[in-house]
């Protein structure tokens, strides 16, 4: 297999369709996959790679649950996994984050996702591809995930930047989703969509633009960066962008603000509770 980058261009992927150790995964909603997908792609349902419990919407599942999900799509350790979705790649990014957390070695995201492929006139198929089931063993490392306790331990660390990637309205409490609005103390804010060029098939902006977006808010490579949103859906995309840019010390908060904002013992800046 060639040495694909973290974000792969659709035209770069095209000549490798059918390569033996290439596994293309469409993690869009099932109906989108049925209507058309990259030739050879198998479908993976997003709910299979997240775990709801208590007030948490999308934590990382236990090892045995992840093992079943990845085995069902025939994943093997030697596969280079190429992933995309139809919603500008947050689901694809969450799966890539999960693969990195379990130390799967080779993975990429299609730059622009499904739009980056089909809107540029590349071939599309509608055949439902049924994979041969594998036995894929999962062991989480904890190196990519920031737990609530981990974040609490870093709140006063000057070498750590906590990055909130939610909508402006969530950050400012105009939109309240959890019991307690607000933000993790000290967090800086950058809406995850700022890095995506809607006029270029939802591909990423050039690297210099991306770096400037982050530098303006103090997100620099020398720091450890912890990214979060409500469910580590949008923040997973920002995680991938940071890794693409060469940031080596990045973690994602899998349980997200759905855990932090529904807990009773977490510190919150600009806390807001709607009593109506």
Residue ranges and their predicted role:
Residues 1-35, 89, 111-179, 268, ...:
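Flexible, polar/low-complexity N-terminal or interdomain linker segments that lie immediately upstream
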Residues 51-80, 193-225:
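Helix-loop module immediately N-terminal to the HCX5R catalytic loop
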Residues 58-154, 174-175, 182, 234-251, ...:
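Thiolate-centered catalytic microenvironments shared by cysteine-dependent enzyme domains
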Residues 156, 162-205, 213:
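A mid-sequence, solvent-exposed acidic-amphipathic segment
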Residues 226-227, 245, 265:
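C-terminal soluble interaction/assembly domains
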